Amino acid sequence: MKVDYIIVGQGLAGTLFAYELFRQNKSFVVFNDPNQIKSSEVAAGLINPVVFRRMTKSWLVDDAFPQMETTYRELEELLHEPLYSPGRMMKILSEDGGDFWKEKVFANQLEAYLEVEPNLNFRNSCISNTFSFGCVNKSGRLDVQKLIFAFSGLLTQQDSIRNEKFDYEKLVLQPDSVTYDNVTASKVIFCEGSAAAQNPFFKNLKFKHSKGEALELKIPGLELNEIVSGEVFVMPIGKDSYKVGATYTWDELNKKTTDSARKELLDKFQNISSTPFEVLNQKAGIRPTMHDRKTVIGLLPDNPQIGIFNGLGSKGVLLGPYFAKQFAGFLNGNSTFYILKPIFSATSNANKLLDYFSDLPC
């Protein structure tokens, strides 16, 4: 069997990259390990175009946001599923945070994403009335789990997915192609998320994965339409249910949920609202993150038949569609963007093994 690409992994990165190849009429086979720990399985799908800690735009947001909206609307049409829900996010401000908010909106040119004036009119009887809020107009949510499940169904219909663990030792490299089992392709692209830390082809990459836990609560009296962001986010997902998250830890990177995370999330939620609730679910996942929190994309210089698309991290829902389109375009020779940073050999001691895409057009 001959295809253009082999894709390893069908989390968010693998799904978005496969969709771009599909859109560009390229053939591929996806190998997906159903037992792998994936952040996509528990991701809230929160879309946030700013970095609240510094009150700056998220990396590449001016290019990434319109591409994100286009891609998810296209996927909704292709899969016949509602996936993307744009909306507002209300950021809880500190007592003197209103002036800082207003100052940074102007200083960092955030008017396209945020309301300039702190919002003093947002009220919900179940949210503490001691808060003032900053309003993020361009926020929302992607149903990541529904997207991955529906796209997997499409791949199954097209006989383009194999739900099995990829064995690195069985990959055979030729000068201009790769072969795995009975599949030959021009390139193999690894979209493995946190599992990439065990990939022998990328052993010099500096991963810094983190574990995140989130809760699903049933809160009949809350009646909240907006996402609220404070010490935790509270995101409506329908039928009086809300996602509340998320924790960050850098040890015990597994799928086990913990009592400590549950307590942390509930304590922080109760700082926002005293409304009675019922815990419906608790999940844990591993965020695929690089040491510098930047997405890593590129081809091995010594073996350009091997590539990687990884490290989307907490901004993956926003940045993923943009990077997937640029990477697929680059591989297929029709990208209008250059990769600017130097590529280092897999055998070098360089901290950076691969390139990052730049937002500068050629």
Language model features: what each stretch is:
Residues 45-125:
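Dinucleotide-binding Rossmann-like beta1-alpha1 core, especially the glycine-rich loop
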Residues 134-187, 191-195, 321:
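Helical element adjacent to the flavin cofactor pocket in flavoenzyme catalytic cores
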